[in-house]
Curated annotation (Swiss-Prot):
Its EC number is 3.1.-.-. InterPro entries: eFR1_2_sf (IPR042226), eRF1_1_Pelota (IPR005140), eRF1_2 (IPR005141), eRF1_3 (IPR005142), Pelota/DOM34_N (IPR038069), Pelota_arc (IPR023521), Ribosomal_eL30-like_sf (IPR029064), Transl-rel_pelota (IPR004405). The N-terminal domain has the RNA-binding Sm fold. It harbors the endoribonuclease activity. Its cofactor is a divalent metal cation. GO terms for cellular component: cytoplasm. It comes from Methanothrix thermoacetophila (strain DSM 6194 / JCM 14653 / NBRC 101360 / PT) (Methanosaeta thermophila). SUPFAM superfamilies: Dom34/Pelota N-terminal domain-like (SSF159065), L30e-like (SSF55315), Translational machinery components (SSF53137). One of its GO terms (molecular function) is metal ion binding. Keywords: Cytoplasm, Endonuclease, Hydrolase, Metal-binding, Nuclease. This is Protein pelota homolog. Monomer. Gene3D superfamilies: 3.30.1330.30, eRF1 domain 2, Pelota, domain A.
């Protein structure tokens, strides 16, 4: 994400952004809220005064519109962010329109900004300068390949093949070649690759990659995992391999924060969870790190909590419920905190 203009008075005003990736569209989903004013270049059918009786003559033109947002829709598989609302600036004022935002789109958002939203923008800008990471998990006859996004690991391929046991070694060779090709395709010219899995299959796959894609080896890191699939992705993230490659990825950070939280809860330590307990900790000025699932940040009591914690120099981390750490936090009520000191009745 790139910030191209920032014009704020206090916490209100305009920020103009360029969405550079699918991750940025996901961030924008959480930055744009109903009631915000959003400007972007878009396509719209424009009818002249003489064309009103013949709507088929309406011409689709490129125009810049400002809309008052009513709904925001984003699906990771679509590569589009759809912002729907009423036109407030430009042609056909008062009519409804949907802005389709994709990677490369520029838009301006005018609103009252929460501290966590401004922090999210800073994180998105920082993340855009970090390398991409592909996670490849392989065991006999089975492989799962995912791309690490800021909202979680996006599975891009699941491959099944022969193990070579009873079906001939050529079947196994074909399987390994197919997996190697998919990894190379996903990695492109710049992504780092973490290759993991149980047993020695990953070592055999590495040899195939060395023969077929020797230039990729300098970007490849080997690791262990007990299985393929989602649980395997989570295991690799917990081991810290991704952190060593990308410094501190969002998902690895969320996983570690949740692990720290659960340790503190288990030992009756410096932790609070649930809105009532966390609000009490905020009143004491005890919150070091506030952890909230993304689905709750626009709720009134949570929004005021975020502002109070930010004012007290606490850190605010918004968790995605699309991945396992966010699901764990959601099970605790969606709100928790690591504390500077214990407070009466916490945990």
């Amino acid at each position: 994400m790139r910030v191209i203009k920032r014009n704020l008075r206090g916490d209100e005003g305009e920020i103009s952004l360029v969405a550079e990736s699918l991750d940025d569209l996901w961030h924008l989903k959480h930055l744009v809220s109903p009631g915000d004013l959003v400007f972007a270049t878009t396509q719209r059918k424009i009818s002249g005064a003489t064309d009103k009786l013949r709507p088929e003559k309406a011409e689709r033109r490129t125009v810049r519109l400002g809309i008052s947002v009513e709904a925001v829709e984003f699906h990771t598989y679509s590569n589009w962010l759809r912002i729907h609302g009423v036109i407030k600036s430009g042609v056909d004022i008062g009519s409804y329109h949907t802005l389709n935002i994709e990677a490369g789109s520029e838009l301006s958002i005018i609103k009252r900004w929460r501290p966590d939203e401004l922090q999210r923008i800073e994180e998105a800008v920082a993340e855009s300068n970090r390398p991409r990471v592909v996670l490849a998990l392989v065991e006999e006859g089975e492989a799962t390949i995912g791309v690490l996004r800021q909202f979680g690991v996006q599975t891009v391929a699941e491959i099944r093949g022969g193990s070579g046991k009873g079906s001939g070694s050529s079947v196994r060779d074909d399987f390994l070649k197919e997996v190697a090709d998919q990894i190379a395709n996903s990695a492109g010219d710049d992504a780092y690759v973490v290759l993991a899995g149980p047993g020695f299959t990953k070592e055999d796959l590495r040899k195939v990659m060395e023969a077929r894609y020797p230039d990729l080896l300098k970007r490849l890191t080997m690791d262990d995992a007990s299985s393929t699939g989602r649980s395997g992705f989570q295991e690799v993230l917990r081991r810290g391999t991704v952190d060593r490659i990308v410094e501190a990825s969002r998902i690895s950070r969320e996983t570690r924060l949740m692990d720290d939280l659960m340790k503190e809860i288990a030992t009756d330590g410096r932790a609070a969870y649930g809105i009532r307990e966390v609000r009490e900790a905020a009143n004491y000025g005890a919150i070091e790190t506030l952890m909230i699932v993304d689905q709750l940040v626009r709720r009134g009591d949570v929004e005021s909590l975020i502002r109070d914690v930010a004012a007290g120099r606490g850190r605010v981390v918004i968790f995605s419920t699309e991945f396992e750490p966010g699901e764990r936090l959601e099970a605790l009520g969606g709100v928790a905190a690591l504390l500077r000191f214990r407070i009466p009745g916490a945990s």
